[in-house]
Every structure is written in structure tokens, then in C-alpha cells.
Amino acid sequence: MKIILKQDVAKLGKRFDVVEVKDGFAIHFLFPKKLAAPLTKKAIANRDLFLKQQQEQYQKNRALAEKLKLVIEQTPLTFQLKQHDGKPYGSIITKQIINLAKQQRLDLQRFMFKDNVRLQFGEHKLILHLFEEITATLTVIVNPENGTTN
């Protein structure tokens, strides 16, 4: 009997796969547990509609990530860090970068950063993971504050 899976089933297939199984297995195990449905024209139409919507959502998310990449790479973030005798007093962390980015209308999330960041003086290039293979390079500039602390 040909069926369409409603959920992932171990050793059988993934959701929306069309598989051939024995009648008893389908009728007594898969159908009662709502793991599968008989292969009908309606089931095939639902499957095709779902896969089409999933592909459209994927393309939409990919396009948004590409736009965000362009904005991130054109927008450097600049911080002022206190100093004492020319040495940095503290450091810039991921949370501060995210907050400044939000003020500049960049929607960065913590999971985009590969590691926790602690930056000192200078220009730093951070690689952000946006979407699957799409990465962006964020420029963060940390300048010493004009006054010194004692």
C-alpha cells in the first residue's frame, strides 16, 4: 500500500515522503497513530502545497538575510572605551554590540555571533552567521575615550 507520511518515522522516511508499506503495518500501526495517511489525490495536493509554501518561505528568508548582510557590511559600529594610562579600562562585549546595533535599527541576535566577544581598542571584523551559508562581516571600531580615569 502506498502512503504519505504525516511525521518523520524512523527507518521509513521523513514527513511528506511517499512510501510503500504492507497493508497491515499501515492499517494497524501508522494510521491509528496518525503517522501516515493513504496516498490520495487530496493528500498529494496538500503535500505539494506545503512544499511550495516551504520553498517560498525559504526564498523569502534567504532574501532578507542577503539584505541584512548588505546593511551590516555598510554600517560600522563605533564605541568609546574608557582608558587609564593608555590601557583599556574594560572591554566591549556582545550584548553592547547588539544594543548599539538596535539603536541603529540593525536586528542582530546573539546566536549570529560565533563566540562571545570581548573587544579592546582598534578596528575589529566580526563574522556573523545570518542564514545557512550566508555570513556578514561587521566592523566594530573601539576608540579610547578622550578623558582618562584614575
UniProtKB/Swiss-Prot annotation:
Looking up Gene3D superfamilies in the UniProt record yields: Ribosomal protein L9, C-terminal domain, Ribosomal protein L9, N-terminal domain
A GO biological-process term: translation
Keyword rRNA-binding part of the UniProt annotation? yes
Q: Name one Pfam family in it.
A: Ribosomal_L9_C
Write out the entry's keywords from A to Z: Ribonucleoprotein, Ribosomal protein, RNA-binding, rRNA-binding
> What is the superkingdom listed in this entry's lineage?
Bacteria
| Gene Ontology terms: cellular component | cytosolic large ribosomal subunit
What GO terms are given for molecular function? rRNA binding; structural constituent of ribosome
| InterPro entries recorded | Ribosomal_bL9 (IPR000244), Ribosomal_bL9/RNase_H1_N (IPR009027), Ribosomal_bL9_bac/chp (IPR020594), Ribosomal_bL9_C (IPR020069), Ribosomal_bL9_C_sf (IPR036791), Ribosomal_bL9_N (IPR020070), Ribosomal_bL9_N_sf (IPR036935)
Family statement drawn from the similarity comment of this UniProt entry:
Belongs to the bacterial ribosomal protein bL9 family.
Q: What does this protein do?
A: Binds to the 23S rRNA.
Write down what this protein is called: Large ribosomal subunit protein bL9
Organism for this UniProt entry: Mycoplasma genitalium (strain ATCC 33530 / DSM 19775 / NCTC 10195 / G37) (Mycoplasmoides genitalium)
